[in-house]
Amino acid sequence: MKGIVLLSGGLDSAVCLAFGVRSLEVALCLTADYGQLAAGREIAAAAALSAHYGIRHQVVELPFLREIDCSALTGRLGLPEPEEMELDDPVRSAETARQVWVPNRNGLLVNVAACYAEALGCERIIAGFNREEAQHFPDNSPQFLDAVNHSLAYSTLSGIRVISYTQQLDKAEIVALGQRLGLPWSLVWSCYRGGDEACGVCESCRRLERAKRSAGGVRV
């Protein structure tokens, strides 16, 4: 069986790539550039991870998303910087989720990947969803996966399906899985910003740092 990985270069998608190369034939890694602040770092991380596993890498340009988007991820708003104690606060988490929400991003990316998958004869699209963020990002949820697969049954002739090896895991469990898979941590970029070093204070950095400690002090 052949598959395509939606690869941002971050924790979840990197672990899905590491798992995917052991589970099926990965034909392509796709990275989206929609004008996000971390686009350059994400593309570089995804390219390095793809090269590490010997997989072809391609960048898909989606400039219109930045033109219509008012998300903090594209710089239209200031990035939220929640304290670690706020990560499990449902009100604060819902607020930060709204700030970084990109309209229909995962729905769009899955369908772009489906075009490539069908053209390349791939049966699976691998995406890095997770249980922790599904609480406030519906496009990480099992319901989203079921719905998009129902749609793909009609929009593709070959019955392509989206799978995620991390969807039932929280961030600490994903870090632990990455450790078991021998993920090259130095190649991963999870920060919402695109500086020389991870900022350490955006929500993505906070969640990764907490996950590392929960997984036993993993050095990522």
Swiss-Prot record:
It is an enzyme of class 6 (ligase). It catalyses: 7-carboxy-7-deazaguanine + NH4(+) + ATP = 7-cyano-7-deazaguanine + ADP + phosphate + H2O + H(+). Binds 1 zinc ion per subunit. The keyword NAD does not apply. SUPFAM superfamilies: Adenine nucleotide alpha hydrolases-like. One of its GO terms (biological process) is queuosine biosynthetic process. Gene3D superfamilies: HUPs. Pathway: Purine metabolism; 7-cyano-7-deazaguanine biosynthesis. This is 7-cyano-7-deazaguanine synthase. It comes from Desulforudis audaxviator (strain MP104C). The gene is queC.
